[in-house]
Amino acid sequence: MRLSALPLLLLALLALGGCSKYRFDTPQSAYTSFHEMVKRGEIKQAYGVLSQDTQKAVAARAQALKDVSGGNMKSEPYELFFMNSAQPADVTEITLVREEGDVATVRVLSSGQAREVRLVREASGWKIDLSDSLKP
């Protein structure tokens, strides 16, 4: 009797292990997870990988657009953030440039071009921080 339950238990453990394919324990893994979410069209989840400051800035812009439209615009901040975004190019390399406390910078090589991305560590892990680029 006990032996027949073992395969079901193993199957359940394998299924649970596959649920968490995204990682946020390092700046590189957080960026990789964010990139994968965007590529898969998982924009609501990808929005959750943005830092709290970035989400606040996007929400403020979304509210300003709603106010200007007289309340006719019904889009959520995450929808506005990713609206008209092209499919991201494949990333060929992600390198940690620096990590100082809860702030890190990674160098992302994509389509032969490199750019630096800032990340911050929050309670749930590393997050993409674009708040400086969203300032008016």
Model-found features: residue ranges?
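Positively charged n-region of N-terminal signal peptides that target proteins for export
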Residues: 1-5
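Exposed beta-sheet edge and beta->alpha loop/turn motif
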Residues: 83-136
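Bacterial signal peptide processing site
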Residues: 19-23
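Bacterial N-terminal signal peptides
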Residues: 7-15
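Generic signal for short, ordered secondary-structure residues
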Residues: 13, 24-25, 98
